[in-house]
């Protein structure tokens, strides 16, 4: 019997690379098969290809580490930032809702304004000050709205 599949998008980025690097040494590797993909294998902004790809693989879990991360460039290229950070996440969440797949969405501390004097909690008020932060928050909201029991958001800071 084959192991359930964990699909990791954005595998050439910082987080996707780190997941791959530590996968074999983790306890998760004994129970799940890892499939890392990047934009050259799967363009998340091409909804038709995305749905077809996921339909062939039937992953049990998707870790979405793909993102438009150029904070300054997002200000002038809002369409591209929202396409990957929000609209592609919506497509993933819709597919996961129908298929029963779990979705782990990697987000950012840029959803906050940075004014807090203590560490942010999971229920802290968001207030993004940039297009990048706003686009990532939109993606978070898609996951949490469509997948209240099987969608997870992990906010990171590098």
Residue ranges and their predicted role:
Residues 98-102, 148-149:
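A short helix->loop->beta-strand "cap" motif at the edges of active sites that frequently abuts
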Residues 47-84, 97:
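NAD(P)H-binding glycine-rich loop region in Rossmannoid oxidoreductase-like domains
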Residues 4-25:
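N-terminal Rossmann NAD(P)H-binding glycine-rich loop of SDR-like oxidoreductase domains
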Residues 35-48:
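Rossmann-fold cofactor-recognition segment
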Residues 27-35:
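A generic structural motif
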């Amino acid at each position: 019997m084959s192991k359930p599949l964990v699909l990791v998008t954005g595998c050439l980025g910082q987080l996707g690379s780190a997941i791959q690097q530590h996968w074999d040494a983790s306890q998760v590797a004994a129970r799940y098969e890892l499939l890392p993909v990047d934009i050259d294998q799967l363009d998340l902004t091409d909804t038709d290809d995305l749905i077809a790809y996921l339909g062939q693989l039937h992953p049990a879990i998707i870790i979405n580490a793909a993102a438009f991360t150029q904070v300054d460039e997002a200000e002038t290229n809002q369409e591209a930032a929202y396409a990957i950070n929000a609209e592609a996440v919506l497509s993933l969440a819709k597919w996961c809702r129908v298929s029963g797949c779990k979705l782990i969405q990697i987000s950012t501390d840029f959803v906050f304004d940075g004014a807090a004097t203590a560490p942010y909690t999971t229920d802290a008020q968001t207030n993004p000050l940039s297009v990048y932060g706003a686009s990532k928050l939109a993606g978070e909201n898609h996951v949490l709205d469509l997948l209240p029991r099987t969608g997870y958001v992990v906010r990171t800071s590098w």
